[in-house]
């Protein structure tokens, strides 16, 4: 057996975070246990867990402090409430049948325990570490999380200490608000009026990017830190370089023109994926996007079927979305140009995943009100709107 578990519990300086391994004495966990007990490290001295002095639990459990212990006051928090809490959690896990009683002499546990140097309340240190250890053991032996849970939660989660959310496009449809006005003050004011929604994307349009460069992304981030921001460069050359520029500027997606050479599009997509951002292929003036897609080594993340501002007065269609999805089944389809409120049901009915709207929102007298109308037309609830966040 070689199982791994993790759990975080509590709040404030007494918050507990436990990483642990549980496995056979003769396996890698047993080897790690023996190494830890015999190869001491200054400030991270391993110690056996004990319910009280002279009463260790079974399976035998080794505690390793994560934070460097610098004085006896900090040591007392480990050699006391944390040591006892971990031991009691192991013993109770046996009593409750989580750890099989007939295997306690064959198994060992190695637990890495976090104690903040500023933690003061011994009662909370004990209770939080008890709960975190017990939960980590249960998760380890149940194989939690399984891969389906990981994939389900990975795009929802925000690391509490990181302090911001990295938004991904996994729950379409979305409204993409395109800011083509090169007046930065106007753009930032309008962005501040866009409702916070899981289904809104912010686009730094081509004129805005041309005037201020990709550094405008950081200005937008100051107004909307968690937004998914698309940089509409309409790249025609040096695809890998421009993708890297957008990634370095903390953008979430870069737009490449479908008129660019195939090698440029390929390099841009490869670099975008390497740096963790989305690659968007804009089909403006490309009359045969399917032919382009068939020549690519890797599909873009988003394919934008685009009618330009200069020709919006004419009748149009957004192309054969069904055929495109057959070639690029994992790609999201965006439609741009002439997307007005009455066209939303039509676009969604044709299979669009992203509706790109510019002046209909950004030039409105009441930006917030019009944006809310488009968001409501998506008929999509907020992600986890009614979820009480406890275990995740």
From Swiss-Prot:
Xref: Pfam families: Fae (PF08714), OMPdecase (PF00215)
Keywords assigned: Carbohydrate metabolism, Lyase, Multifunctional enzyme
Q: Name the catalytic site residues.
A: 17 (proton donor)
Coiled coil segments of this chain: none
Extract the ranges annotated as region (Formaldehyde-activating enzyme).
1-161
Q: What pathway is this protein a component of?
A: Carbohydrate biosynthesis; D-ribose 5-phosphate biosynthesis
Q: What is its EC number?
A: 4.2.1.147, 4.1.2.43
Q: Where are the annotated segments for 3-hexulose-6-phosphate synthase?
A: 162-392
Catalyzes what? 5,6,7,8-tetrahydromethanopterin + formaldehyde = 5,10-methylenetetrahydromethanopterin + H2O; D-ribulose 5-phosphate + formaldehyde = D-arabino-hex-3-ulose 6-phosphate
What function does this protein fulfil? Catalyzes the condensation of formaldehyde with tetrahydromethanopterin (H(4)MPT) to 5,10-methylenetetrahydromethanopterin. Catalyzes the reversible formation of ribulose-5-phosphate and formaldehyde from 3-hexulose-6-phosphate.
Identify this protein by name: Bifunctional enzyme Fae/Hps
The organism is Methanosarcina acetivorans (strain ATCC 35395 / DSM 2834 / JCM 12185 / C2A)
The gene name on file is fae-hps
């Amino acid at each position: 057996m070689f199982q791994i578990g993790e759990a975080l519990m509590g709040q404030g300086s007494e918050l507990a975070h436990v990483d642990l391994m549980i496995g056979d004495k003769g396996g890698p966990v047993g080897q790690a246990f023996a190494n830890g007990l015999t190869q001491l490290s200054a400030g991270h001295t391993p110690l056996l867990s004990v319910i009280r002095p002279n009463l260790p639990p079974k399976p035998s459990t080794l505690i390793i402090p994560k934070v460097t212990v610098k004085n006896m006051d900090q040591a007392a928090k480990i050699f006391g409430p944390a040591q006892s809490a971990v031991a009691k959690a192991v013993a109770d896990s046996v009593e409750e049948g989580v750890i099989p009683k007939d295997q306690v002499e064959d198994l060992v546990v190695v637990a890495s325990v976090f104690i903040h140097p500023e933690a003061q309340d011994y009662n909370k240190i004990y209770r939080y570490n008890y709960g975190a250890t017990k939960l980590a053991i249960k998760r380890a032996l149940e194989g939690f999380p399984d891969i389906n849970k990981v994939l389900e939660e990975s795009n929802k989660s925000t690391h509490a200490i990181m302090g911001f959310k990295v938004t991904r496009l996994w729950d379409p449809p979305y409204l993409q608000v395109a800011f083509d006005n090169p007046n930065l003050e106007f753009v930032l004011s309008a962005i501040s009026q866009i409702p916070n929604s899981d289904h809104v994307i912010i686009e730094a349009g081509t004129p805005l990017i041309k005037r201020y460069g990709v550094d405008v992304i950081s200005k937008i981030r100051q107004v909307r830190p968690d937004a998914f921001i698309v940089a509409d460069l309409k790249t025609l050359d040096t695809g890998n370089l421009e993708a890297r520029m957008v990634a370095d500027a903390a953008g979430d997606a870069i737009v490449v023109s479908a008129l660019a050479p195939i090698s440029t599009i390929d390099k841009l997509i490869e670099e975008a994926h390497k740096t963790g951002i989305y690659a968007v292929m804009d089909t403006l003036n490309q009359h045969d996007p399917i032919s382009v897609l068939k020549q690519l080594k890797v599909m873009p993340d988003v394919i934008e079927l685009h009618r330009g501002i200069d020709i919006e007065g004419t009748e149009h269609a957004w192309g054969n979305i069904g055929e495109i999805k057959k070639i690029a089944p994992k790609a999201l389809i965006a439609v741009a140009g002439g997307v007005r409120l009455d066209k939303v049901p039509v676009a969604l009915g044709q299979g669009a995943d992203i509706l790109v709207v510019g002046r209909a929102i950004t030039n409105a007298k009441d930006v917030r009100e019009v944006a809310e109308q488009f968001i409501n037309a998506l008929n999509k609830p907020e992600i986890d709107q009614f979820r009480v966040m406890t275990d995740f």
